[in-house]
Amino acid sequence: MKKPVVIGLAIAAIVTVIAGGTWWYQSRQDDGLTLYGNVDIRTVNISFRVGGRLASLNVDEGDTIKAGQVLGELDHAPYENALMQAKAGVSVAQAQYDLMLAGYRDEEIAQAAAAVRQAQAAYDYAQNFYNRQQGLWKSRTISANDLENARSSRDQAQATLKSAQDKLSQYRTGNREQDIAQAKASLEQAKAQLAQAQLDLQDTTLIAPSNGTLLTRAVEPGSMLNAGSTVLTLSLTRPVWVRAYVDERNLSQTQPGREILLYTDGRPDKPYHGKIGFVSPTAEFTPKTVETPDLRTDLVYRLRIIVTDADDALRQGMPVTVKFNDEARHE
């Protein structure tokens, strides 16, 4: 009798375990997938593109910032001076280019022609004097030194005539294409320097790139700053994203566009609504910040969830429970 009783008890225990497991599995299926994540921390380090002395800051930590808002300014004076110099450089280059295009005036050509005539007369005189000196040298009336001096004077007069003739030829034919191109390039370079000076002056004003809340004010007016030095740190408040991770077994449930519910400790009975906006195409080891114990040794995929009804109570870094049950489709 004892043996049938033992067998019966064993069968009853097995049935109980199976029933309990079935109930647990069904309850897990009814509850849906649950993940744990955090509100994404999204910040921007705001800096001047140019360096200089910080003249003013118009905001403080905790202030609400609007895109396009003036946050602070550098000392403008050095950049205003540079802009004036750049404008003067453009004026000089423009004048030089215009001269190259216009060529030489009639008065300049006439002066060059007169210089040629004068140089020609000087050369003719030097040549005739040299010829006479040669005759005297043959009769040994003058010394070799006197003849050499006459030759040098003739050669110098010839060089002066050649230079005057070349100058007159240039005046009559106008400037070379290469010279005009060089003047044009100098003008374009001066204009580029002017544009850069205007941009540098514009960049002495610090403009908010987007809406947000000011987290930190790293420096104070009077500080000397290098280009790119962080002045302010802005927390981007919209849109609000939640970062969560899912293992490969449940990856099929996390399709982009799927609606889900997001719970926080501060309002457990009033969930936020969200949609999956991005699923990472590559797996990674579970980050240390993930709170789910059974995922800590798994390869997981990162999710970005866009909160569609976020408010100021949903702060960056806040832990969030992500529910994938069917309620999210009807809430």
From Swiss-Prot:
Secretion signal, residue range per the UniProt entry = 1-19
- GO cellular component terms listed in the entry, alphabetical order: periplasmic space
According to UniProt, the name of this protein is UPF0194 membrane protein YbhG
Species annotation: Salmonella arizonae (strain ATCC BAA-731 / CDC346-86 / RSK2980)
Q: Which family does it belong to?
A: Belongs to the UPF0194 family.
Q: Which UniProt keywords apply?
A: Coiled coil, Periplasm, Signal
Coiled-coil intervals in this record? 107-208
Which Pfam families has this protein been placed in? HlyD_D23 (PF16576)
Taxonomy, superkingdom: Bacteria
InterPro entries for the chain = CusB_D23, UPF0194_membrane_YbhG, UPF0194_transport
Where does it live in the cell? Periplasm
